[in-house]
Design a protein with these regions (language model features):
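His/Met- and acidic-residue-enriched segments that coordinate or traffic transition-metal cofactors
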Residues: 2-9, 13-15, 22-176
Length: 176
């Protein structure tokens, strides 16, 4: 594994998170953007649910991971997911969005991680992140193809999709 490649990819994740957090995305319906319809709400809920699992599993990995690259990825991922969740919540009028609870599949993955230790934990975390990122990418691509008139939501999905592709590459490098 090329450690510099992994570290450069992780540094890029931080820049994207900062850009999202400072993007000044205006609430739905303002700034000339279309209101949040059913497609936008579904995209947001799905993104927040899978992102929440990525964040929680990464917070666990910060504590439990043995491999330094896994631990560093987890730190960047947790921070990025927090930033993305803030941006998504800011897009809803009144910001009354609650964090969705994980479904059974994601809850089972979290339980497996909580019980794993050492290299088995590292491998399970990276595999779980890879699967989660593939799921997040599918959510973003489906939304982008939907032709939403909400410019902010579409732009966030496009930016997220780009970063998710990079994360998948970094995760594959970590797996070796």
């Amino acid at each position: 594994m090329d450690r510099r490649h992994v570290l450069l990819g992780l540094a890029g994740m931080t820049l994207t998170s900062a850009a999202l957090a400072q993007s000044g995305v205006s609430p739905a319906g303002s700034g000339g953007s279309a209101a949040m319809g059913q497609a936008e709400q579904q995209w947001m809920q799905q993104t927040m649910m899978v992102g929440s699992v990525a964040m929680k599993s990464s917070e666990l990995a910060i504590q439990k991971a043995d491999d330094d690259n896994v631990k560093q990825f987890a730190k960047f991922e947790a921070d990025e997911q927090k930033g993305l969740a803030e941006v998504l919540r800011s897009m809803v009028e009144g910001a009354a969005t609650t964090q969705p609870q994980p479904d059974q599949k994601h809850a089972a993955m979290m339980e497996k991680l909580e019980q794993a230790k050492g290299k088995a934990f590292d491998r399970a975390y990276v595999q779980g992140q890879t699967e989660g990122h593939q799921e997040l990418l599918q959510i973003q691509e489906t939304f982008i193809k939907s032709g939403s008139k909400n410019r902010e939501a579409t732009n966030v999905a496009k930016l997220a999709a780009s970063r998710i592709r990079e994360h998948i590459e970094v995760l594959q490098d970590i797996l070796g």
